[in-house]
Amino acid sequence: MSNENQAIGDQVTEYVTVMIGGQLFGLPISRVQDVFMPDRVTRVPLSAPEIAGVLNLRGRIVTAIDMRRRLGLPPRTDDKPSMAVGIELKGESYGLLIDTVGEVMKLGEDTREPNPVNLDARLARVSAGVHRLDGQLMVILDVDYVLNTAAEPMAA
């Protein structure tokens, strides 16, 4: 193995795992500011459908993004409370509303793969690659893409 390949094999990324609509996602831990249960979300009139609203998190105004809507998935049918992952982009705070938060996983960059050709197009749009875990595919969430496209105003 060359030195360059050895360096890639030694690189490890930590991911916060989350479930959205039965799909496992990994968010690079370096991007995650908070994990919290959203309290009151105030709807914002005329906002994009995936913008659930805004909330107050320890004195900060946070834009809440409904990841199920963002991915084109049906709304939850259970009564379990949503969780949120706090992310920051360009000085703005966002809360990605998700179903559940899992564990933190350390995964080697050498096991990261490009999107499989049969990956659902809704997932492929927001994916920065995948890791194959024991019988499950973890989609690496491209946080910048999700936030940049959610923040863009809709064309009139």
Identify the residue ranges that each predicted region occupies.
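An acidic, low-aromatic, low-complexity terminal/linker signal
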Residues: M1-A156
